Amino acid sequence: MSQLTESTFHSSNPVTSFNLFYSLSRGQLRPGQCWDKRSFRRKFIWRSLLIPHLTREWMTELAQWPDLDSLLTRQPRLPVRLHRPYLAANFDRKMRLDAVRFHYHVIRQTFLPAEFKALLSNSGLQLAQIKGKDDEIFTVTMMMFPVLDKEGESTILVQNGAGDVLTKITFTFCEYHGKSTLFIGGMQGNSQLPHETTQKATKSCHGIFPKRIVMEAICRLAERLNIENVMAVSNEQHIFRSPRYHDKNKVILSDYNAFWASVGGECDSRGYYHIPRTLARKSEAEIASKKRAEYRRRYQLLDTIHEQLSLMFRH
């Protein structure tokens, strides 16, 4: 992995768009195991040739990235972003290109070098730690998962004290109608965990579901980075609704619509939920007196995420 310094993400290996395309096509550059397969490289060539103008624009964009080598180690399928559904079933190729370009522009502009390096690491960038009942520590982390790369460039997850991943939400920074936007393309629980583990975590966090904790981190991150909107894909526009996946038995395991609505989201005509950047909280007057202490503890726990994020990124 390339070394990251305060001079910020500079590479000593300038590359042209043609050289990048040629190196990937010939197998001279193999950022991940998928590129070891000739069939994968052949598909890359043919699909690229079907959209020559966008291919040229995308290869030129990637070739200009000073941190390309480092990013390809974590996102080896970056060069094929235009070839598959991405973020939402109705995102066209130009929207995909613009979204990925904008995402990494935001990262470069707002992350300190050490934070960017942590984001690229296997352990990810720790955003916050929160203390539940019995002093159990829950960790909120931002990282990259190649297996989730169709749903977004970055993922925020929460782990319990044993290190179990409870929930992940995947997103990309993009522009939507001229406004900077954090766009959520995927949400995953952990089907490998017993349901009791999630129940225990919820109880430890004073009744806050793990995905609600991650959603708080998502919104606080958007606020911290001056991202104007938070949006999310609906059940109907999830990438698995794309014709590409109709015959592949892809299943959406979460009810996206219900969760986005529960945090105040409203769906637009394109099938995207618009979520308040500041999630609503009940006032004391709305809470039964016997439950007020519990709600105060919930909000104090969520506030610790905001407090820790406020110390991160470029001021």
Label for each model-derived stretch:
Residues 1-153, 157-167, 175-180, 189-197, ...:
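Terminal substrate-recognition subdomain of acyl/acetyltransferases
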Residues 200-202, 206-219:
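Conserved acetyl-CoA-binding loop-helix of GNAT-fold acetyltransferases
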